[in-house]
Amino acid sequence: MSADPSKDHYSYAAYADPAMARSFDNRRFSGPIGELIAHSQARVLANMVGRIKDRQMLDVGTGTGRAAFSLALGGARVTAVDASEEMLAIARQRAAEQSLTTIKFQRGDAHNLDFADRSFDAVVSLRMLMHTPEWRRCVSELCRVAARLVIVDYPSATSVALFESMARRAMHGAGMKTEPYRVFTRGMIADAFDRNGFRIRSVHRQFVLPIAFHKAIGSRKFTLWSERLLDHAGLLKPFGSPVTLVAERCAS
């Protein structure tokens, strides 16, 4: 993220920190629960994008490149954009280590993407809208450059993420070092896509219990069992988070 809006927004400085870039994947995807989240994210992404071999895909807010790698391994030709050169350096290094030659990494801003309209078959942006200064503007840009599909995720305002979001915002306001984020209702997201000529096609919700709780327990077996139980109890649909969705361009 960068270009013009709110250059002093915390997200620009936070993700430009070399220490953040080096520890990013370890903080989010290490341990049994982190690995479970990573595998689930890759599976959901694959199901939503469908056939991607030789198709042009854009990953916005690629970070260390995890989603871009999944797409490239599926046969897509991927352009991966991030505002943080430090994050991109990690992504480029890992792509080279895996001999992934079908990913083009470049610095760019989600608020002002440097691509022509409908340049990509599908556009993916994970864990980004929650941190952007102007999320509606970002949705407009994602939709503008997508020929057919846009896939995003977000923390739900009807989940326990609401309370963590409130706490982090309060901590940030008090000058404490943290990563505040916003939460979204389904209506907010649906309206933003509708304004740009897209309709939500399908939705996946991941956890009812907080991710931090599952990581503290550290048991894949417990996480799968407890979340399955809560799903059967009817709690996943109203309270599950994060929410990943695929939106499709409406016929002209």
Task: Kindly give the residue locations of the regions a language model identified.
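Conserved class I S-adenosyl-L-methionine
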Residues: 2-52, 54-63, 149-173, 225, 229
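Class I SAM-dependent methyltransferase SAM/SAH-binding core
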Residues: 64-111
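A conserved beta-strand element that flanks and buttresses the S-adenosyl-L-methionine
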Residues: 124
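A short glycine-rich, Lys/Arg-flanked "PGG" loop and its adjoining helix->strand segment in the class I
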Residues: 136-149
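A C-terminal cap/extension of S-adenosyl-L-methionine-dependent methyltransferases
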Residues: 167-168, 201-252
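Acceptor-substrate binding/catalytic loop of class I
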Residues: 171-188
